[in-house]
């Protein structure tokens, strides 16, 4: 059996070909096989041909010859040659020998032959072919041999079925006769179509099987009747006949031709208007118009040039003028008509124009490929054809090249007559033209491979950059190597000469890079794929440096540390520190640092020389940040003993100014003191409660001092010497330090010094200023197509400094990058954001900015989508009008927007009025509406508007006013197509017949059955304004009949008729009996069931059961006859038989069963044991797997392996460099199931060399060798 998917290999190297031979000549067929000695059989009509006076068989090596001597008409037909499993068919066609006959006038047309006196049609014997049977029927047995003269002495057939031809719609009968004189029982005949289709299961309207027996001649006649032939019946058929010990079969073919068209008519007779009866006298048709073209004068003139000897010439073979006309261009029609004597040119042209061109019917293909196929990339596709010959070989071509089997890419299948090509894992390379070739015929198709849409898995992000910065857009798609397109504001981007745009692919990621962004690069950038697009906005701003935190004045003492710190908006900006206008050079005491956006100047061990003006100048910007360093000098004066304590502060009137410190900075209060003895210093902070200063939008807003009332509840003692807030006291001063000032450190601090002589006290006010608190979440309003309005409230705390303005940011909902919308501070509490993308969900947030810096961001706003109102709905029309209602319908607007539609609003107003009234409360999601409670007779205008998140769109209004008044409409039933034929329902099934109708006002509906009104509760009628329903909950047989429905409006009505057929299971067959039993066969006979279930009987199912097990097995299904033969029963067993009847509902509930078992007798059998020839299994040794060269490492055990076969078991010997290793203990030899192993224990360099394995038995000797190299590890 050939490997699945591969074409079987033919046994013939040269195949015989069909030939045409003249009658009486010999015909020679030659075939060559692949090898000599192959048994070859020659067949004709399915029977073997043996050497005789008629047939000659010869064989020379691989050449085989069949000679048919003195070929006659009876030898014409189909032949075959068989070698092994290969079978080749060929045909022999016999041509009649040419005879010299005088030229005969063409036969007249049938219409003229019956009407012209003195003319008679030629007899059938002169025409050379038999007349067709009436109504297109023919018989395949007419040309066969008669029953009295059997031509097959070897087989069972007296007469075999012959090949037949029939036209579409005609009938044909195939007959087979079997001699029964020598048969003990009737033969079993089976008819097949193709290889496997048993025609007994196809018996029906188009196919019938008949058999009879002639007792006089003792001949069985079997007939196959085909009626109303269809083109699908064309093909090869087979008749098999079998008896107890004989078997024979016969093959024949059926060809169904298309119905005969006008092209099959005798063109010369149909369009010749004159006859040459009686000495060439011209007879004209009296009804012909004298204006019709007539070539008779030209024909006479042509005949005058002929010589007398022309009449003695042989009559040439008649040509098919119709084929000549079909293939000739229209310009040649007159010449052809003149040449072949066609005088009625106008009638010929009219008939030719009405003819359709018959397509050439394929003889090799029963079913061809479709014109085109489509498959998605990565899927598989199956291309299937169906052949007329089951044994034909096919070739599959791709773009003209034959497809070879390669792995699992292409799979070839052959199942019966079907040939299938399966292409797995289709790629773009498989998009091509494919052809299936059978012999000289082929059918073509095209395969289109569709790529799946490339989807956006990670969209683009909006970006905000400065002029000159690098921009990189990144997007991720679903397919690697996908083709994408970059657009800017709708224009495709390409690689320019300046290489401004760079496109980069990294797997599924695609990058667009702009090395140096310019102001003109701002806009919307999009990446388009076959499955969608990603859109992002690029905003390019001119460079502008913002100062988030400026440097502040410092007052430090000797040996202290001074730190100036500032923060700018750009972390890449460098700067220069100046001291009194001169650049400051860092050293071991002065350090300059730049970390991110923070620039810091640190001076250790401050000296009086460090007191100066310090400035920070950013590079590239006209900006200058300045502050002053104050050095606190301690003066030592001589104080006599017993001096009262005193606090030395340079504060006029002892009312110190407020000390301002930025949150996060270090606060150090160095208070000089004096006194003798040394005073005790006490630091206290007053705990107060007062009003917070409200956030002010502008720095120049007036300050209300009347609302700053404070109440002092208590004082907190500060005495810690370590920690964030600490106090350090020396002999001449007290130092109060706060690391990282916070808002809670703000307040009034009291310094008290005491000694026995007295005390002194000073209050110091410290104010901590900070960035503002984060504002509340902004609110979004007035959302438009690409804009919205953002509103927010001031922060609860302004950080002790007036609010300078606000900064606004936005981002896409699914993104993580916030984009700044403004560089200039917004002074108001609202802003209109523009240049947004419609249909994209955004979020907004806001920052507050004061002199100290920028606050934390506010919480994000509620997500919102910029969207514009939809356009007006389309195709507004009035569907129906009554006395109080109007039905409207429309279609959705052309532009809906990304947010979809919320619904539609419908309004109306009287003609001439401008006030519109809502037709319904709220919105409707449907595109139709019934407006009720309208005044009768009013003329109203209607309009419809579409609504979405952005609000209502433009309205669409009816072109003319609608008059609210009922329109009279004739009643009409619209019977569905499936109700126009007989309605079949099974017993117990519900019946629900819905019939729509039209008519205004509402028609009156009436149902009748067989002319009588419907009665009973089982049948119910339900009517609505537009349809009526006949409903039966459970159908019964009594419900079958003809129903009529009538709709009536006044004197107008319409009727429709329905036929209901309620079917049930049939009753079982009657009188089942065994008519005969012989050999292994039993003949059964029964009568049809009494009740067929009110429908056509499909057939019978015959089953058998062994008496021992009583397990039923099906013998025949869908059997149409009332008698059958059950073959192949087991000898010695008893059988019961039963038969079910079947229709469209199912099988009968019960079966007709035989009452008594039928026993199959056991005949005597003589066992003859078979003789077997002793087989010699001896075989010389041979290595199936030889030794291979190896390189091993010294000290590690190595193995050499090979495999050997032989019978008897060979003796194995191992050699190294010619020395036998059998006595060496360092080598171990193993042999298991033919696998030989030599184990070398811990080899050393001396073990290297050539190793040989020798196998020896009585049949011979074999050896193999290899080289072993032992390497010493380095």
Curated annotation (Swiss-Prot):
Keyword line: Acetylation, Actin-binding, Cardiomyopathy, Cell adhesion, Disease variant, Disulfide bond, Immunoglobulin domain, Metal-binding, Methylation, Muscle protein, Phosphoprotein, Repeat, Thick filament, Ubl conjugation, Zinc
Cross-referenced PANTHER family: MYOSIN-BINDING PROTEIN C, CARDIAC-TYPE, TITIN
Annotated organism of origin: Homo sapiens
Location of the Ig-like C2-type domain: 153-256, 362-452, 453-543, 544-633, 645-771, 971-1065, 1181-1274
Originating gene: MYBPC3
Post-translational modification: Substrate for phosphorylation by PKA and PKC. Reversible phosphorylation appears to modulate contraction. Polyubiquitinated.
Pfam families, alphabetized: fn3, I-set, THB
Effect of residue 654 to H: In CMH4; uncertain significance; as well folded and stable as the wild-type
Top-level taxon of origin: Eukaryota
Gene Ontology BP annotations: cardiac muscle contraction; cell adhesion; heart morphogenesis; regulation of cardiac muscle cell contraction; regulation of muscle filament sliding; regulation of striated muscle contraction; sarcomere organization; ventricular cardiac muscle tissue morphogenesis
InterPro entries membership: FN3_dom, FN3_sf, Ig-like_dom, Ig-like_dom_sf, Ig-like_fold, Ig_I-set, Ig_sub, Ig_sub2
Family affiliation: Belongs to the immunoglobulin superfamily. MyBP family.
Residues carrying Phosphothreonine: 607
SUPFAM superfamilies (alphabetical): Fibronectin type III (SSF49265), Immunoglobulin (SSF48726)
Mutagenesis or variant effect for residue 278 to E: In CMH4; benign
Protein name as catalogued: Myosin-binding protein C, cardiac-type
Effect of residue 755 to K: In CMH4; destabilizes the structure of Ig-like C2-type domain 5
Modified residues (Omega-N-methylarginine): 1241
Effect of mutating residue 605 to N: In CMH4; uncertain significance
Purpose of the protein: Thick filament-associated protein located in the crossbridge region of vertebrate striated muscle a bands. In vitro it binds MHC, F-actin and native thin filaments, and modifies the activity of actin-activated myosin ATPase. It may modulate muscle contraction or may play a more structural role.
Disorder noted: Cardiomyopathy, familial hypertrophic, 4: A hereditary heart disorder characterized by ventricular hypertrophy, which is usually asymmetric and often involves the interventricular septum. The symptoms include dyspnea, syncope, collapse, palpitations, and chest pain. They can be readily provoked by exercise. The disorder has inter- and intrafamilial variability ranging from benign to malignant forms with high risk of cardiac failure and sudden cardiac death.
Region (Disordered): 107-153
Record has Metal-binding as a keyword: yes
Disulphide-bonded residues: 436-443
Biased composition (Low complexity): 107-141
